[in-house]
A protein has these predicted regions:
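Glycoside hydrolase catalytic-domain context in secreted enzymes
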Residues: 1-403
């Protein structure tokens, strides 16, 4: 990043620095529970502290903006992105979203630009199908799905990201009424609006733009400042200004907002601020992740008072994750599995008497089919010794595969 930034600024006539962005969703090098888990802590101060640590680690890598937090009210477990949200309650999403923005943008020398997403209604897609339309009443939309944004905007996030979906058959990335009328005029947002991945180009696929050129016009007029990963702005914006189809002042407004974001991050004074700074995956950071994990746990029942487990009693730990390092979950692109301690390693380190059995991983065993495992377990055990060991002990902790 240092080399790219240096070469770019040398070649740029006005020496305007680049801003590097990435998905830092629930930690950077130190990984915390997913946002849905963090919501279970009901501890916004800890959420803010975790975001501040993530900002420090991200800025040390040269990243100065994240596409987080996601505060879509999510009530359909079929929706694949529900793990990024703080759950089903608008108030919890608003409180936790604001706390996360505060954490990301808190410290002058290591802060990163926060991005509220996805504006708006993305969590209400029909049948939980990603990219689907949203059909809800205006009252429900404003009171339930816009409310978290209204709350989190008080923290003054640098960016807001548009949603993929359409409201009343109008895709958000080209929806002037929502982006200018509601977000900017009514809610007072003055920062940068960025599209989601390719969502401007998808205006053509959604049937509201005849071609990519018209998609660029609609998005620009709606107030989208940054076109993420579609060719619409890059290919057509300059031509549209020259032909008079888009006012030059409209492009100037968007450019000004992006420049202001860079200025607020201090990139003009020091485009390398935080780069190479130490503090990644420190013991302090690990302890905060451990604290968050503990506070995120939800005890559903403890009828026979099995918990807490006694360290004096032998316990069987059974399942594929007993010896696995894959505990970082999704959207943890900067986490390293090599840094994770397995359950088996931790038990040995703490000298706790336990036996770990991995068993069969039905999700990644290339030679295994679910119906075969079911048949073998009912007729002839796949591993008789494994089953015998489990049934011999009074206490078994199941550590199954988590699939998202």
């Amino acid at each position: 990043i240092y080399d790219i930034q240096s070469r770019y600024m040398e070649q740029h006539p006005h020496h305007i620095p680049l801003i590097f962005m990435a998905d830092v969703i629930h930690g950077c090098r130190t990984i915390y529970p997913i946002p849905l888990g963090q919501a279970c802590s009901f501890h916004p101060e800890l959420v803010s502290e975790a975001a501040s640590i993530a900002a420090l680690e991200a800025s040390s890598e040269g990243l100065r903006a994240t596409f987080s937090p996601m505060i879509d009210v999510s009530r359909d477990p079929r929706w694949g992105r529900i793990m990024e949200s703080f759950g089903e309650d608008p108030y919890v999403n608003g409180i936790m979203g604001k706390a996360m923005v505060d954490g990301y943008q808190q410290k002058a020398d290591t802060k990163i630009a926060a991005c509220l997403k996805h504006f708006a209604g993305y969590g209400a897609v029909n049948a939980g199908r990603d990219y689907n339309d949203v059909e809800i009443s205006q009252r429900t939309f404003l009171e339930q799905y816009v409310k978290p944004f209204r709350m989190a905007l008080k923290a003054k996030p640098a960016m807001v990201m548009t949603a993929f979906n359409a409201i009343d058959r109008k895709p958000i990335s080209g929806n002037k009424e929502l982006l200018k009328g509601l977000l900017r005029d009514m809610e007072g947002f003055e920062g940068t609006v960025i599209s989601d991945w390719g969502s401007i180009g998808q205006l053509e696929e959604q049937g509201v733009a005849a071609d990519m050129e018209e998609a660029a016009i609609q998005a620009s007029e709606a107030g989208v400042d940054i076109d993420m990963m579609s060719p619409a702005y890059m290919m057509y914006l300059e031509k549209l200004v020259e032909s008079g189809k888009i006012p030059e002042a409209l492009v100037d407004e968007s450019a000004f907002r992006v420049l202001m974001m860079k200025n607020q991050l201090g990139l003009f004074e020091n485009p390398f601020a935080g780069l190479g700074k130490s503090g990644k995956l420190t013991q302090h950071n690990r302890e905060k992740a451990y604290q968050m994990a503990g506070e995120s746990c939800v005890l559903l029942k403890n009828e026979k008072k099995i918990l807490p487990l006694s360290v004096k009693k032998k316990v069987i730990w059974a399942g594929p994750y007993t010896a696995s390092r894959e505990f970082l979950s999704r959207w943890s692109i900067f986490g390293e599995h090599e840094s994770v301690e397995t359950i088996e390693e931790v038990l040995q380190k703490k000298q706790i008497e336990a036996e770990c059995i991995t068993g069969c991983n039905i999700l990644s065993d290339a030679e295994c089919k679910v119906w075969q495992v079911e048949q073998e377990l009912s007729d002839k055990p796949r591993d008789e010794q494994w089953l015998e060991t489990i049934t011999r002990e009074d206490t078994v902790v199941c550590v199954p595969v988590s699939y998202t």
